[in-house]
Amino acid sequence: MRSDHPTLLTAIRPTTFIESAKLRDHLGLDITIATETFQHTGSFKFRAAYNLALNVEQDEVLTASSGNFGQALAYACKLTGKKCTVVMPSTSARVKIDAVRGYGATVDLVDTTKVGRNERVDRKSVV
């Protein structure tokens, strides 16, 4: 692990917990909901992505994603100074593609009717 970057615990935002009176009344159970919508990139996936970017030895990271993990990894790589390529289906939502690019990653769009995302990642990883 590189010591010049924040640890996972200092990089993530705290999880917000919400008690649901409505569910308690309906189900007769105390229900607490953990929400990760305030996490970087709006998803719990930033936790895994940052941990990966922080601990992988390579300077470039390659993944397949339809959006959320790709965004999280792109942002994590930006924070850790690594290059990131995200293989995404060409049918991915434009907002997801733009978000991945906005975090500085290269987006490789693939027609998944002709080749799978993981197959494309495998091909790119041997180059």
Give residue ranges: language-model regions:
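PLP-dependent amino-acid enzyme catalytic core
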Residues: 1-127
